[in-house]
Amino acid sequence: MVVTASRLHAIRYYHEFKRYLERHHYDDLDILVAFSGAIKDIDRAGEEVEYTEEKLNKRADGTHIKESQLKEEFHKDEYAMLIVAEKYQTGFDEPLLHTMFVDKPLSGVKAVQTLSRLNRTAKGKQDTFVLDFANKPEIIQASFSTYYRTTLLSGETDPNKLYDLI
């Protein structure tokens, strides 16, 4: 997941990643973008174009992906990345998320909710990774410290019991 600072940044990231995939012949991979409303930008030909989430998100057969279908589509093997602008930073319970690139200032509850998208367990998921281009570690740590509480265990626990639930 790439967390961007604006809808304009999201569509620009989208176009750059699409060009990269095409240039390097990653024909079996694709990306999805999530943002609300419509945004205008200048394309490579110098023309003003209006973009929407549905207009950009297409299946291999060319059909458009509606917003209501986005979460389901993300589960398909070809979608390796989701680029977001003020979407899916809260309440997006997706265990498949492993890596997050953050290019947006975060603090407080927004930082906790956004970064916590990665903390869901999934079969085969051993760790997570965050590459943050926009935030200082001490601000993120302070954001989490508000919610941090010490937990004392009365006895030894078996961490593998978590996987039995999956």
Regions found by a protein language model. Give the residues of each.
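RecA-like P-loop NTPase motor core of helicase/translocase proteins
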Residues: 1-166
